[in-house]
Regions:
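Flexible, processing/modification-adjacent segments and terminal tails
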Residues: 66-68, 139-210
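Transmembrane beta-strands of outer-membrane beta-barrel pores
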Residues: 88-92, 117, 263
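C-terminal motif of bacterial Sec signal peptides marking the signal peptidase cleavage site
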Residues: 25-28
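N-terminal leader/targeting segments and the immediate start of mature chains
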Residues: 30-95, 304-316
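An acidic-aromatic
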Residues: 110-163, 167, 301-305
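Gly/Pro-enriched, hydrophobic low-complexity segments
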Residues: 31-35, 181-300
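Bacterial N-terminal signal peptides that target proteins for export
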Residues: 3-18
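Edge/loop elements at the starts and ends of beta-strands within beta-rich repeat scaffolds
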Residues: 73-82, 92-97, 104-106, 127, ...
């Protein structure tokens, strides 16, 4: 070039090289590459592949969660009847009662606990749940409490009805306000997948005033623990925990012969807590029994609201 000395020529070449590298950098940005510092090393990350990989990982985790919930749901027994003799224990903090008894449950029909005098075998009390009502019978004093679920304080203030109680007694998942859990309902739950060295995953569900948590075995899906928290602006906070042990074979499935549930609540003016433990001698599927209790005119009906107080005072 005329009129350009060597120094100017070198400057022009340097500018051209600089522009060339600038174009390369812009091209790199156009390809959506960015530099990430990782442990003081510079690593190239390609965004065009990262997003699909993340989506694939999230989708894979969601499928794992759904498959586990399905496994838990599939553990329920097929039989319509669960029966057996039992040992019944009630602890209210300042009083403990241990009595023999029996349990009879018919799916979607009734849950019945009967308590007997030791050795004699005479029935002293009965607690019966049906879809329509709750019945508590005191055989010794010939008194009974009967009311629907809105009339029974400790059930109403804890958001419990027959179907939620049935799910708890039968060692199954539940959804508040629903009679059962369908296949399409399974996606409503979330799962906290445990680490490889842990034995249980945690299933959770929250809605309005309810918080539910189930602990279930990673391998067979069997539920071992349930926690139900109910928060009410009018009635305070209640916590129900339910534990299952000593599973017995019922057909191709299994059923917990030992159940322990604890209710703590401040919903009735003062803090109350009760722990009930049921230990079945064996788990049967007998169907030859009446599903509804009938009482003679000799029994006197008393106030329905304080049924928990009646149970906890163990008047029978």
């Amino acid at each position: 070039m005329k009129g350009i000395n060597n120094k100017q020529r070198k400057q022009l070449q340097l500018k051209a090289i600089t522009m060339f590298f600038a174009v390369l950098l812009l091209s790199a940005c156009g390809a959506k590459k960015q530099l990430v510092k990782d442990n003081n090393k510079v690593v190239a990350v390609n965004n065009t592949t990262t997003a699909p990989q993340v989506a694939k990982k999230e989708n894979s985790e969601a499928l794992l969660k759904l498959a586990f919930i399905q496994k838990v749901a599939d553990t329920k027994v097929f039989n319509d009847n669960i029966t057996g003799s039992m040992s019944f224990s009630l602890n209210t903090g300042n009083k403990t009662i241990n009595l023999p008894g029996s349990i009879k449950m018919r799916k979607n029909k009734v849950i019945r606990l009967q308590l007997f005098i030791p050795l004699l075998g005479t029935e002293v009390g009965r607690l019966e749940f049906t879809p329509e009502y709750v019945l508590v019978v005191d055989r010794l004093h010939r008194e009974y409490i009967k009311g629907d679920y809105s009339q029974i304080d400790f059930l109403k203030t804890n958001g419990l009805n027959f179907y939620s109680l049935q799910s708890l007694f039968w060692n199954q998942l539940l959804l508040p306000g629903q009679n059962n859990v369908t296949e399409s309902d399974l996606k409503k739950y979330d799962v906290k997948l445990a680490a490889d060295n842990a034995s249980q995953n945690i299933i959770t569900f929250s809605k309005d005033k309810f918080k539910y948590e189930w602990k279930a075995d990673k391998t067979d899906g069997r539920i071992s623990d349930v926690a139900v928290q109910y928060n009410s602006a009018d009635h305070g906070t209640s916590l129900l925990t339910w534990k299952y042990n000593n599973f017995k074979s019922v057909g191709v499935k299994s059923f917990p012969a030992e159940q322990e549930f604890q209710l703590s609540t401040n919903a009735m003016q003062k803090q109350k807590q009760a722990t009930i433990k049921i230990s079945m001698d064996e788990v049967k599927t007998d169907s030859d029994w009446e599903e509804r209790t009938t009482l003679s005119d000799r029994y006197k009906k008393i106030e329905a609201q304080d049924v928990l107080g009646k149970i906890m005072s163990a008047g029978f």
